[in-house]
Amino acid sequence: MGANVDINIKQGDCLELMKKIPDHSIDMICCDLPYAITGKHWDVLIPFDELWKHYKRIIKMGGAIALFCKQPFTSVVVQSNLPWWRYELIWEKDKGTDFGNANRKPLNAHENIEVFYNAQPTYNKQMLKGKPYVKKNYRNNDEDDLNFKSDNSGIWVNNGERTPTSVIKIARDNIHKGTNLHPTQKPVALLEWLIKSYTNEGETVLDNCMGSGSTGVACINTNRNFIGYELDEKYFEIAQRRINECLL
């Protein structure tokens, strides 16, 4: 995986760097924008007017834009381009957070992913695994005995796959194994799920706030081209190392 993908990552202000992206050349934008709630130097709100000016120019017709967020920032994100907003996905984490407030409120165990597009995008259903089931009251009239139980009591109509829902259950990267390298890092498996859902192999994904480079890793793993920008020098170096290791 990833041997023939095109990777283009740069350190700097994404609003300046996106000016160099050709019009309507991006198949998907997948980004965890700064929420401006931590007070950290890297957590500074990007002006939405200017951000959407770039997004609208560079995204292809029918390209999906998936933006991570959580309340109260979620409401701001949705309202930033309501005409293009389509629906919300929920990432359900394997463990809750904010144990310091566990006696005051429920643990935080999810984040929002807001999906925007200007026309129907590629949608490759990422089927869920489940228990195969039998549709009963059908007799075996198939001469080749395909898809039927041997006792003629029913027909296998499903191999266990289920249509995905708006809730995605994926574990966080393990901080104790050194795979969690950024305070707001998203699991590579979750990013792969999104990328495979809304793009095909060989297409191009942009993450204009790539942090430690997880979206780039997910693109390499799924044979997508990647453009990534990061303002912070430390996290850019981490992203560069991770992505280079994946390309070896």
Residue ranges: model-predicted function:
Residues 1-228, 234-237, 248:
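Core catalytic lobe of class I
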